[in-house]
Structure formats: C-alpha cells, structure tokens
Amino acid sequence: TFLLTIVPVSIPDVTDSITALASKNAELNAFLQQLPSGYVIPAENLGSAGMFIGILSAFIGVEIYRFTQVKGIKITMPAAVPPAVARSFESLTPTIIIILGMSTITMWLGIDVHSIVGTLIKPLVNATDTLPSTLIIIFLIMFFWSFGIHGDSIVSSLARPIWLILLDQNTAAVAAGKVATHIGVEPFLQWFVHIGGSGATLGLAILFCFKAKSKYGKTLGRTTILPSIFNINEPMIFGAPIVLNPMLLIPFIVIPLVLATIAWVATAMHLVNCAVTIAPWTLPGPIGAYLACGGDWRAAV
C-alpha cells in the first residue's frame, strides 16, 4: 500500500545536442550509453518524511481487508481446498482493491499524496521544534512515569515520526556542508535531559550509593548506579520508590525541565552542535552525546 502512494518520476532524457557533443568524445559517449532511462521512485519518500504515509497506509490496508471479510466480498473456495490456499484466494480481493485504488490516485490522476500530507503536517513539525513543545513532551513523559507508566513508550512513540523528520533534515544539512538547525529532536532529550534514564536519576543513584543513611538506600544505590550509567533506571524508579512518592516526584519532574532549558539555550547559542544522528540509548551519556552530535566534544562535556 505504501509504495503505491509514491508517484514515480521520469528520468530526464539526453537531448540531441548533448548526444551530438558526446559523439566527439569516446569516454563521454560511453558514459551516456550507460545512463538509465524510464521511471524511478523518489528516494526522499522512502525516508522519515514518508513515515506518516506509512502509518496511514497500514490503517487503510487493514480496514480494506476487514471490510471485505465482514461484507463477504471475497473469493470463497470449496471445503476440500486446504485452508492456507483458501486464505490466499480470500486476500486477492482486498489486494486488487488496494492496487486499483492507490494506482488510480497516484499513477493515473498524478496526485502526490506525500506532498499533500507533508504540507498538512508542516505546522506540527515546526511547532515540535520549539522549547515550549519540548518542555511539554518532557513533562508528559515524567507525568506518566509518576504513576508507574512507561512515559517514553507512550509519548515518544507519538512524537518519534516528527523527531525523525527533523533529525533527517539535520543530517541532510550537515551532509550538504551546512549547519544543522533543528534542536528539538529525540537525541536532544536522550543525551541532554534523560541523563541516566528518564528523570535524570543518575545523580540520585550516586547520592543513594554514597550518602544514604539506611542500609536499604546504600544497597539500592550500589545496585542501580551501574545500570544508570547505561540509562537503565527502572530499578531506581520502582525501588526508591519514585513512583507515587511526592518527595521524589517533584525533582523527578522539575530537573529534566531545567536540564532541557539549559541545554536548549546552549545549543541555540551554538555552544553545542545540534544532534544529527541516533546513537544507541544504552551508551554512557558523554559517549552517546558525542556520537549523536556528529563528533562534537562539547556535547560530551
């Protein structure tokens, strides 16, 4: 379904004047003979920019299949036919509907669905790349964690398609020799906000390890400090506990907001480069920040 939303573009033909010029040069003529012809699929639609279309295509494909099954619009085979073969014939009807429908829109009518959706979501993408939006996202993540719900899995799953679009633009800018300008991407939160995991609990693990007065606190600190270095802090969140604990929830929510503001100002002042790639989230903070910002040592500091 997704590939059918992409309008193929034709490869420009070599003009007669270029052909005449190339005939006088054997190497140039050989090069022109090797050039492809026909149509190609634009590669930019296969990247992060096409993620929204991919999500919509999945919904459309599933709904068409469900509709044909509920309404009985399918090829029914005799009972003697093996179930696997019968299911293959049943899926032919929705497949034909999808191919004809999407081909009519893209191939025959020439409607660029990617361009339309890109225009519609552009205000949302621009709004996400702001400090207030980033603070709201962080607050929502911490809010869900406060009740023991994995905030990153819920909020980040919704914001990730937009983050990837912004990150892709940063990567393209650096590849073209320009400066990346989008600050509000996922690696920004990962390496400058969630230090030691959601809520920046690495400092809390160190505090428990060396300053806790109770035996339980010291044991918890020694147990969680190593995982926290690699951004795994569920033992601290549920062991302290931070969940449903007002005394720890306040810094758990406020500290990431403060860190985000400081890091945003530093990046906006070009003290640190914008993130241009995704580094594995289990890396220690300085290493991950260094890699995500394209080898900028200031990010590690």
Regions found by a protein language model. Name each.
Residues 2-3, 96-104, 141-163, 247-269:
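Hydrophobic alpha-helical membrane-insertion segments
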Residues 1-150, 283-301:
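Signature of multi-pass transmembrane helix bundles
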